[in-house]
Amino acid sequence: MTARGTASRFLTSVLHNGLGRYVQQLQRLSFSLSRDAPSSRGAREFVEREVTDFARRNPGVVIYVNPRPCCVPRVVAEYLNGAVREESLNCKSVEEIATLVQKLADQSGLDVIRIRKPFHTDSPSIQGQWHPFTNKPTALGGLRPREVQNPAPTQRPAQ
């Protein structure tokens, strides 16, 4: 796919993160799993063993566990910007679920898309971007404006 066909945006920081204090973007994790389904065994073990450690490491994240007779276990992540991500935990081990949940906690909730420029500022310079000839005098060899240069000598007809 070409660059014009893919979504892109400029580099921004979510809620100006890093200025002041860091605010984790993950707001809520909801686990839906079955008590007896074999596909939910890894999710049940994660909830029994690892979810308290995750909650201690991430005190700003609210964790809900919904035991219900469902066929596919899943985790739903809700972010501060309103984005909702749903991931399936079907037949995954405890380690795979732990890495998935940590990945959801580290994300900002924004879609992963192409960044147009690797730099961004809210107050761009009035002078423009720097280049090697920024502070060089313009009176060098061929850099003078045309109206300042001496015109070519004109030949006068003989009288």
UniProtKB/Swiss-Prot annotation:
Gene Ontology biological process terms in this record: mitochondrial translation
Keyword Metal-binding: no
GO CC terms in record: mitochondrial inner membrane; mitochondrial large ribosomal subunit
Keyword Signal belongs to the record: no
Subcellular location per the Swiss-Prot or TrEMBL entry: Mitochondrion
GO molecular function annotation: structural constituent of ribosome
SMART domains assigned to the protein according to its UniProt record, in alphabetical order: L51_S25_CI-B8
Residue span of region Disordered: 123-159
SUPFAM superfamilies xref list: Thioredoxin-like
Keyword vocabulary terms for this entry: Mitochondrion, Ribonucleoprotein, Ribosomal protein, Transit peptide
Subunit structure: Component of the mitochondrial ribosome large subunit (39S) which comprises a 16S rRNA and about 50 distinct proteins.
Similarity comment text for this entry: Belongs to the mitochondrion-specific ribosomal protein mL43 family.
PANTHER family in UniProt: 39S RIBOSOMAL PROTEIN L43, LARGE RIBOSOMAL SUBUNIT PROTEIN ML43
Protein name stated in the entry: Large ribosomal subunit protein mL43
Organism field: Bos taurus (Bovine)
